[in-house]
UniProtKB/Swiss-Prot annotation:
Annotated family: Belongs to the NifW family.
Top-level taxon of origin: Bacteria
InterPro entries to which the protein is assigned, alphabetical: NifW
Organism expressing this protein natively: Rhodobacter capsulatus (Rhodopseudomonas capsulata)
Protein name: Nitrogenase-stabilizing/protective protein NifW
Gene Ontology BP term (one): nitrogen fixation
Amino acid sequence: MTPESPTLAALTKLSSAEEIFAFLGVEPIREVLNSSRLHIMKRFGAYLRETDMTGLTEDGIFERARDALLRAQADFVASTPLKEKVFKVFETEAAKRKARFVGLETLKVIKS
């Protein structure tokens, strides 16, 4: 990420998902945004952090940011927040469920 970028600086000043979508010219899928808003924004931030923007023009940075938002939204079109496990609480819950699982092969039959 390139913090000196006017595009990225402007993104940090926006306060709502709707403002971010409008700034990047992305039409939100309303039902997805309404049910997964925080998850989309967190995933968008993760995609931005992992994107190398070194040497890109301002237009290139804008396009990469836009692509990151489109990708983040798309993740929740075909999936759910629970399946995507964006937040630690979901990861922890999945680990607990896995630990509670007892496979049939571990059970022993005791004859009396």
